[in-house]
Amino acid sequence: RQKLSYSNPIFIKLSPDESTETISLIMEEIRNYNFDGVISSNTTIDKTLLKDSDAQGLAGGLSGKPLYEKSNALLSDLHSLDPNILKIGVGGVFTQEDFAKKINLGASLVQIYTSFIYEGPQIVSKLLQ
């Protein structure tokens, strides 16, 4: 970062499909390279989270509600490994309870996307009421 004269925050988005051991090693590198924070999480390739077995063969990663529990588990692990690093909680946030859960698991910030697409801008006031 110093070589590039770059001062904006740098976050790394992690996969919820990585093992706890791999996440621990990644967190060591995040600290070594002075990343500003982590994002929990990217999409998952775990299609067993889908209720419709026909959809399990589809390509691509899962986001939204199917990602909620896995992203929360990763967020909890990240917070245990480093409670001081900034964490952005992502994945399956549709209700105030979902939002609060991310914060309670250690998220400094919460990102919404799928709920914004499906419910529109009013989701923001719904989450913050």
Language-model features: where?
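Glycine-rich phosphate-binding active-site loops on the catalytic face of alpha/beta enzymes
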Residues: 37-45, 93, 99-126
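Short amphipathic alpha-helical segments, especially helix-boundary/capping motifs
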Residues: 2-4, 49-55, 102-105
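Extended mid-to-C-terminal alpha-helical interaction segments
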Residues: 11-15, 22, 43-51
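Generic structural signal for well-ordered alpha-helices
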Residues: 1, 23-28, 72-76, 99, ...
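Glycine/Thr-rich beta-alpha phosphate-binding loop at enzyme active sites
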Residues: 29-85, 123
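Glycine- and other small-residue-rich loops at beta-strand/loop junctions that grip anionic moieties
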Residues: 15, 63-67, 88-92, 113-116
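Short beta-strand/loop segments at the ligand-binding rim of alpha/beta enzyme cores
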Residues: 2-16, 78-89
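Catalytic cores of alpha/beta
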Residues: 18-32, 78-83, 93-110
